[in-house]
Design a protein with these regions (language model features):
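Conserved class I S-adenosyl-L-methionine
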Residues: 2-55
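A short, conserved alpha-helix within the catalytic core of class I
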Residues: 130-138
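Class I SAM-dependent methyltransferase SAM/SAH-binding core
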Residues: 59-63, 67-110
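Conserved Class I S-adenosyl-L-methionine
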Residues: 3, 187-264
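A short acidic, Gly/Pro-enriched loop at the edge of an enzyme's catalytic core
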Residues: 109-120
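Conserved catalytic/acceptor-binding region of the Class I
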Residues: 137-204
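Short catalytic micro-motifs in class I SAM-dependent methyltransferases
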Residues: 125
């Protein structure tokens, strides 16, 4: 079971709706793969830094792996990875995108891994769906002593007016709400949480931006009429941007926020 709680995760939302939203992504796996960005290699390198020097090849569990956006960066970095997600449809997409990486169905609160079996547990765009007490405890169980918990999110930079308007239309995500309230909670057995920020941009067409919107839990679980209205408003916004006309592309600015905490 995936748990979400607290005002940062949608005050007033019933628990069953939270669970539905957190496990809804498999229905839009193709949109997720097409529309969601990867992660900066520098952010992944920073998260793994505490264990990189002491391990010949870092053993990493990518939890809430989705279609493998973070998994492929870990593989490129030379890590020995296993990917876990509560949704088999997302893992099927991951197996196509990142062949050869073992996959496991499971959640951050109940990892199907032995005690002290990995050097790092990482979650990309996922910890906001996790009960931080249970997730921290379970990450601590599967990590070896001195192992690291790494959390990372790609957040669109709302200082750009058209990006702010796009977010307003799509509705701010649970992750964005959490960041606005100070960031993720990481509890025992972990100590101090360090953080680092990385800024970058991704060139996207109007079609790719729509796929990104369709990959968000709010749209996936919305009623058909609401989904059509949101997509219509997004198309109207994109029609006002000269860069997106005639199949053109625009730079979507991102702020990637990475966090890490070491298990004693």
């Amino acid at each position: 079971m995936v748990h979400v709680y607290g005002s940062a995760y949608g005050e007033g939302m019933e628990p069953v709706n939270r669970r539905e939203m957190s496990t809804s992504f498999g229905r839009a796996a193709a949109s997720y793969e097409a529309g969601r960005p990867g992660y900066p290699a520098a952010a992944v390198e920073w998260m793994l830094q505490p264990v990189a020097a002491s391990a010949a090849r870092v053993r990493v569990a990518d939890v809430g792996s989705g279609t493998g956006k973070l998994t492929r960066v870990l593989v490129d970095a030379g890590a020995e990875g296993v990917a876990g997600d509560p949704d088999p449809l997302m893992l099927a997409a991951l197996a196509e995108a990142v062949p050869g990486v073992p996959t496991l169905v499971g959640s951050a609160e109940q990892l199907p891994l032995p005690d002290a079996s990995v050097d790092a547990v990482v979650l990309g765009q996922a910890w906001h769906w996790v009960d931080p007490e249970l997730g921290s405890r379970e990450a601590g169980r599967v990590l070896s002593a001195g192992g690291v918990l790494g959390l990372v999110w790609n957040i669109r930079d709302g200082k750009t007016p058209w990006v702010a308007r796009m977010t307003e239309i799509m509705h701010r995500s649970n992750a964005e709400e959490m960041m606005a309230e100070g960031g993720p909670d990481v509890l025992a057995p972990f100590g101090k949480v360090e953080t680092q920020t990385f800024t970058w941009s991704r060139s996207m067409t109007a079609a790719a931006l729509l796929e990104m919107a369709r990959s968000r839990s709010f749209l996936i679980t919305a009623a058909d009429a609401d989904r059509a209205r949101i997509e219509g408003e997004l198309s109207e916004l994109f029609a006002t941007l000269p860069e997106l006309q005639d199949g053109g592309a625009i730079d979507l600015p991102y702020v990637t926020r990475a966090f890490r905490a070491v298990r004693p």
